Amino acid sequence: MFQLKNVTRQFGKKTAVSTVTFDIPQGQMVGIIGRSGAGKSTLLRMINRLVDPSSGSIEFAGLQVSSLKGAALRNWQRDCAMIFQQFNLVPRLDVLTNVLLGRLNHRSTVLSVLNMFSREERIMAIGALERLGIEQTALQPAGTLSGGQQQRVAIARALMQQPKVLLADEPIASLDPLNAKIVMDALRDINERDGITVITNLHTLDTARNYCERVIGMAHGRVVFDGQPKDLTAAAVAAIYGAETAIEESMTSTSINIPAEAPRETASAGLKPLALAGP
């Protein structure tokens, strides 16, 4: 279980995240929504420890994440994989090598420097690409792929870390609706089939409603809503996005529509389960 207690981050005189407190049970899929500048990205970066909290504590399964240093911190960043809006791939390297880079924190320094990957790791990487439906791109330079394909490569690389938690920072913000749906289907498939906790930042209400069992709304660095999608009333939306402008849900839509009567696994059709090898 994740436990955040009074987590705050200040940049000079500006408070980006203010006294955030919540628990997340293992295996939950959580969407964090809010306007740009609400503190969503800073919060995820603190969980991953790319940014340190100014105060407060972050704990995961008894591990004091906010106090980790050295090798223990590197191990946490292995167990807490993160994908970004910008994909963060190495464009000149082929797709397979980019995916294999997810194994670096599982390996010795010498093997990591030499980029020597085992046959088992290569099979695992191909399996991850097959699961995301892009195995045919394995030998292409990553920079030649579309945005949606690059994001799926980033997800495959994250799977190679064998994470306990997957953080997704605006994973569909730069994608068209079709690719946005494919990426969100993949994240939910990982959550449901592997039992991995997924926490994703989203601008869009419809995406949060369709994919997340829990939604956390942020405004001005604070949590102003925490509940199920069905509880996102007009008043809750106004608290998140601001009552000074008449926010309509269509304004924050990516046009990802899943029929209400369809079972959740239908949206993940075509995504194949991946048997992850042991470390």
From Swiss-Prot:
Positions of ATP binding: 34-41
Gene Ontology terms for molecular function: ABC-type phosphonate transporter activity; ATP binding; ATP hydrolysis activity
Domain ABC transporter positions: 2-245
UniProt keywords, alphabetically: ATP-binding, Cell inner membrane, Cell membrane, Membrane, Nucleotide-binding, Phosphonate transport, Plasmid, Translocase, Transport
Location(s), subcellular: Cell inner membrane
Membrane topology term: Peripheral membrane protein
KW Transport (keyword) present: yes
SUPFAM superfamilies in alphabetical order: P-loop containing nucleoside triphosphate hydrolases
Record field: catalytic activity: phosphonate(out) + ATP + H2O = phosphonate(in) + ADP + phosphate + H(+)
EC number per UniProt: 7.3.2.2
An annotated GO cellular component: plasma membrane
Top-level taxon of origin: Bacteria
NCBIfam families found in the cross-reference section: ABC_phnC
Subunit (UniProt): The complex is composed of two ATP-binding proteins (PhnC), two transmembrane proteins (PhnE) and a solute-binding protein (PhnD).
PANTHER family for the chain: AMINO ACID IMPORT ATP-BINDING PROTEIN, PHOSPHONATES IMPORT ATP-BINDING PROTEIN PHNC
Family of the protein in this entry: Belongs to the ABC transporter superfamily. Phosphonates importer (TC 3.A.1.9.1) family.
Role summary: Part of the ABC transporter complex PhnCDE involved in phosphonates import. Responsible for energy coupling to the transport system.
This protein's name: Phosphonates import ATP-binding protein PhnC
Annotated source species: Rhizobium meliloti (strain 1021) (Ensifer meliloti)
Name of encoding gene: phnC
